[in-house]
A protein has these predicted regions:
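Intrinsically disordered, low-complexity, charge-dense segments enriched in Lys/Arg
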Residues: 143-208
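An exposed acidic His-Trp-rich patch
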Residues: 109-159
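Beta-strand elements of well-folded, non-transmembrane domains
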Residues: 75-82, 91-101, 112-120, 135-137, ...
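Bacterial N-terminal signal peptides that target proteins for export
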Residues: 1-10
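Bacterial signal peptide processing site
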Residues: 21-24
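Short, solvent-exposed beta-strand/turn "edge" segments of beta-rich domains on protein surfaces
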Residues: 61-69, 77-89, 99-106, 120-124, ...
Length: 216
């Protein structure tokens, strides 16, 4: 399973940031062309190739003619509470599915995962859940919903005080440091990376299902 996404989808950075309280944010705007927002809340998204799942009928045929059920994860929405010692992030999503054989009512259960990454690669936690979809007789479409949540230690998501001071230090026009972006400082960049978390949601795919998504 590829957990690290090349790009996060479904939830924009603006939405992720606006979900957090103002007390948990570090707003940087010193009037020298530097403006940024650092938040205790994790970024939320769907890793590449894990937002869709396709199942096929018996046998090794993977052509369109043998397709059984296809489903897509969409409408991912996140909220975050960063006022306690444990930062709690919650996300809800919708799964839209379609089947090829519409004869009879049918219930399909699809597994999904939620994982928390720190610094872009370290897996802090992972859990697997299920979403159930019910197709009515004669219908080719069904919809299901899911909800996930994760806790993050507030202390781990907060920047050390010395790093905050480096970032928020007031820079006056004409100062040598005025033209320098504090976020480009290697020490600052490393500290920010350690404090950045992601909560990623996607279908729990088999190796064959993942390979199909990558190559189609």
């Amino acid at each position: 399973m590829m957990l690290r996404a090349r790009a996060l989808t479904a939830v924009s950075a603006v939405a992720a940031l606006s979900a957090c309280s103002q007390q948990g944010e570090l707003v940087i705007d010193q009037g020298v062309g530097i403006a940024s927002v650092l938040t205790l809340c994790p970024a939320v998204g769907i890793p590449d190739y894990t937002g869709d799942v396709t199942t096929f009928g018996p046998g090794a045929d993977r052509s369109v003619g043998s397709l059984d059920v296809s489903a897509a994860m969409t409408d991912l929405r996140a909220t975050c509470n960063d006022t306690a010692d444990k930062v709690y992030s919650e996300a809800s999503f919708t799964v839209n599915a379609r089947r090829t054989d519409t004869r009879g009512a049918r219930t399909v259960t699809l597994p999904y995962f939620v994982t928390v990454l720190r610094g872009g690669s370290a897996v802090i936690s992972k859990r697997v859940g299920q979403v159930t979809l019910t197709f009515a007789d004669g219908q080719d479409r069904a919809t299901g919903t899911g909800k996930v949540g994760s806790f993050i230690n507030r202390a781990d998501a907060a920047l050390p005080e010395d790093i905050r001071e480096k970032i928020t230090k007031r820079r006056r026009a004409g100062d040598t440091e005025a033209a320098l972006d504090p976020l480009a400082d290697p020490e600052v960049k490393a500290a920010i990376a350690r404090s950045r978390f992601e909560m990623l949601v996607g279908f729990q795919l088999t190796e064959d299902q993942l390979a199909y998504n990558v190559t189609r």
